[in-house]
Amino acid sequence: MFGYVIPNQAALDDEAKARYRTAYCGLCRRIGALHGLRGRLTLSYDLTFLDLLLSSLYEGESECVTGSGHCPIHPIRKINWRHSGPTDYCADMSVALHYYNAADKWNDDRSLLGLGFEKLLDSPAQTAAQRWPRQCSAIRTCLDRLAQLEAEGSEDLDAVSGCFGELMAKLFDYKQDHWSPELRSIGFHLGKFIYLLDAYDDLARDEKKGAYNPLRTLSRQPGYEEEMREIFELLLARCARSFERLPCVEDADLLRNILYSGVWLKYNCKQAKETPKK
């Protein structure tokens, strides 16, 4: 369930593209500094969005460090990067999320890939849990509850998506301060959107494999596509409403690009593939 919170590159100018890339590379750099090369395997667009959001909201509360250099992914060409205080938090959350997700894949599906990834990230995840016990405990609790609902074959969309929404709400609540209500709202509705879009995207594959998907029954009902579109629009509207209440200035246009356009890219791509050509 990663890789949905992405920028719409086609709608960004060169400066905005460069700023996104420096944030993405800055997060990768901090993951590597805190958790080594194996930690870099957890780099995602989703946590880059959280880093951009928190760095913008808490701009000025910590130094923004910039630089350029080589890395294992770019050993020849120098790349520019930037990071601030929230970046280290996002680096830890990136490792923790992927660790617990891998553990669930092993426990639920006996996925050897999940087991291998869990073992690989065990030490970094424990380090992250020591620094952020509240958030890491929430990840574990929410994923356990979600796994139980999925094992029961639940098709209560609000319940199953709400588990992942609650997880994301806890992650977005960085400092438990006066911005917490809006941050939790963004995380909650974005998390529900991610979970349901992932189920929507995987439906045909899951049906072919006989795997669990909460949309299986609903997908056979008249008006399924229209209902899913309405659900996605409602969740993102609530997410955007909470974002607009935050005093974000730095990278605000980049954040809006992601929230208003980028998050729709995979949905639009699926629609384009399924629309018959005239």
Regions found by a protein language model. Give the residues of each.
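Acidic catalytic motifs of isoprenoid enzymes
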Residues: 1-185, 192, 196-233, 241-251, ...
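Short, electropositive alpha-helical surface patch
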Residues: 254-260
